[in-house]
Amino acid sequence: MIARNPIKQDPAMRNTQDDHSRFLSLVLRHQPETIGLQLDDQGWADIGELLARLAAKGRNLGRKQLEKIVLDNDKQRFAISEDGLRIRANQGHSIKIDLGLAACEPPDRLYHGTASRFLDAILAEGLRPGQRQHVHLSADGQTARKVGARHGKPVVLEIDARAMRQAGLAFYRSDNGVWLIDGVPPVFIRQTEAR
């Protein structure tokens, strides 16, 4: 019988880790200038420089803490390069970034979670990336429902990805499994129950 580790993470530490994760999202997805950081064309930042600039802004974060944030993030928002020297957000950028993703074949159906208050506009106008570079889609309805619940009463939309692909629209898949597309015309969208 294997004993479970009785040590639980201190809630204060969890909040600190969550706070660091949120701030990293801000810096690596939207506003690197907040700490004077420069991202390369593919969104990568030097880890040493990132940690130094965070410290200069009073956010002391060590290399091991950063790696823990990357590994523990339930949505796998961040990636560390194979050489271990750089970090980037996997998707969700509002700044111009080329993630270097190749177009790939999506499953026949993909899903998008939103709040009910946006439904009429989406069914009339389609899905647009808004301030982000891409519309984010999930491979399953349950994940989409969770995303929609963050914004209000959740609604799950089913996307006919097969028909979109046949119409020549390109899909990309980020390193953490989120499907990305420039937009979804309303003809390919229908409301559904999460599965």
Swiss-Prot record:
SUPFAM superfamilies per record: ADP-ribosylation
Gene Ontology BP term (one): tRNA splicing, via endonucleolytic cleavage and ligation
Alphabetical list of Pfam families matching this protein: PTS_2-RNA (PF01885)
This protein's UniProt keywords: NAD, Transferase
GO molecular function: NAD+ poly-ADP-ribosyltransferase activity; tRNA 2'-phosphotransferase activity
InterPro entries assigned: Ptrans_KptA/Tpt1 (IPR002745), RNA_2'-PTrans_C (IPR042081), RNA_2'-PTrans_KptA (IPR022928), RNA_2'-PTrans_N (IPR042080)
Assigned EC number: 2.7.1.-
Reported function: Removes the 2'-phosphate from RNA via an intermediate in which the phosphate is ADP-ribosylated by NAD followed by a presumed transesterification to release the RNA and generate ADP-ribose 1''-2''-cyclic phosphate (APPR>P). May function as an ADP-ribosylase.
NCBIfam families (alphabetical): PRK00819.1-4
Protein family per UniProt: Belongs to the KptA/TPT1 family.
Protein name: Probable RNA 2'-phosphotransferase
Species the sequence originates in: Chromobacterium violaceum (strain ATCC 12472 / DSM 30191 / JCM 1249 / CCUG 213 / NBRC 12614 / NCIMB 9131 / NCTC 9757 / MK)
UniProt gene name: kptA
